[in-house]
Amino acid sequence: LTLKLHNRISEIGESAWNGLRDDDNPFTSFAYLDALEATACVDQASGWQPVHLSLSDEAGVIRGVMPLYVKYHSMGEYVFDQSWAQAYEQAGGDYYPKLQGAIPFTPVTGARLISPDPAVRQALAKAAMSLCDSNKLSSLHITFPREDEWKMMGEMGMLQRQDQQFWWGNNGYSSFDDFLAQLSSNRRKVIRRERRDVQSRLDLRWFVGSEITETHLGQMYAFIESTYDRKWGSPYLTRAFFSRIRETMRDQLALVFAYEGDQAVAGAINFSGGDTLYGRQGGTLIDVPFLHFEVCYYQAIDFAI
C-alpha cells in the first residue's frame, strides 16, 4: 500500500472518500469535511491544519482514508487535554503541534479509520503513528472513534480513554406521549408542564431540506453567535460554512425555530444520517424558562419519533 498525505480533502475526491464509508454518518462525509476547508473553518491559521491520509494499492486505487489534522492548540476537540499539555511542557517537551484524528468541532462517534478492510484500517493507524515520529509531533490523538476502532488501537498499544455521553433511543414509540408513558408519573408531569409553558408563548416550526433558506441560516447563525458570545467567544463554524452545507448536504439538514409572533427568537440545527438525528448547535435571543430543553431535546425527540 502507498501512503499519501493530503492538505485538502478535495485531493482525494468525493467518490473515492465516500465510496469507502459504510454508514450515513453526516460528519465523516466528504461534503461536511470539504465544507470545513472551503469556508476556512479549518486551516493552519485556525490551528487545524489538514493532513488527511490515503492508502492506495498497486493499481492506484484508494483503499483507505483517515481524517487527520496537525493541531497547534486543543480547542474545538471537546476532549480536554490541557492538563496533559501543561505536564508535558513542565517535563521539558513541546506538546504542540500534535496530530489529531477527529472531525473538527464535532463530538460525535464515527469512523476515523475509513476502509472496509480491517488490515487497511490497522495500516492507517500505524501510518498516523509513524507521522508523529517523522515530523517531530508530540503525540497522536484519535477522538470519538467507533468501538471496533477503539479496541483495535488499544491492541496496537495506544492508550485508551473512556468518557460518557447521553444518547436517546427510539424504542419503537408511536408518539411523544408514547415515550412519556415509559417515564415515571412525576417526570411525565414535569415535561408536559415545561412544554406547555414554552408552547403557550412561542410557536415551534421545523424546516427541512429544500425548505431551508438563506434567511433561516442567517437567523440560526445569530442564535449560535449569541450562545458563543455568552460562553466561549467566536463560533468555530463560519457563516459561509452553513451556506455551503445548504448546497451540498441539504437533504440531511433539519432546523427547528421558536417564533414569538413573526420573529424567530431561538433555534437549533440538526443533521440526519441513516436512522439517527444529530442535534448540533443552537441558541436563543431571549430568556424563556425551559426553552433550551424544548428546542434542543423535546422537539428533536418528537421529530425523531
PLM-predicted stretches and their roles:
Residues L1-Y88, M129-D133, S138-F290:
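A conserved beta-strand-loop-helix scaffold within acyl/acetyltransferase catalytic domains
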Residues Y69-I114:
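Conserved acyl-donor/pantetheine-binding loop and adjacent beta-alpha core of acyl/acetyltransferases
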Residues V108, A119-A127, N135, D148:
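Residues forming well-ordered secondary-structure scaffolds
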Residues V108-A119, G282-F290:
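A short, internal acetyl-CoA/4′-phosphopantetheine-binding micro-motif in the GNAT/acyltransferase core
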Residues P118-S130, V288-D302:
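Conserved acetyl-CoA-binding loop-helix of GNAT-fold acetyltransferases
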